[in-house]
Amino acid sequence: MKNISPHLSIYKFPITAISSITNRASGMYITLIGLSSSFLCFTNENTKNKFYNFYYNLNDYQKTFLNSLILYPFGYHFSGGLRHLIWDSFPHLLTNSKVATSSKFLFVVSIIPTLLLEEKIKNKI
């Protein structure tokens, strides 16, 4: 049987689609973190101590990497929410080229809230 359309690898995946998928994935990730954290609150002390000991036995670089891995989706989702508020207020910004540019910008700008949260955690611990 002959293929009707060419293989999907020839198509360029648009940054706007990647941004949309990442926004949905970060929302699911945040939900998972929330559920995991609440589950941890209801476990016995031995389980909690294992998690705490694991974290506190990491060196500073490992803690920073782990914190960033956990916090980046929060920063991304927050920044994406701000972007949608801006679009709601200024609909003329919703052109294809501006949406693509803002999607690229969003991936970079999300680092700022991640670093701010990371610094807050470092100061608390």
Annotate each predicted stretch with a short phrase:
Residues 1-125:
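Membrane-embedded alpha-helical bundles that constitute the cytochrome b-like, heme-associated redox core
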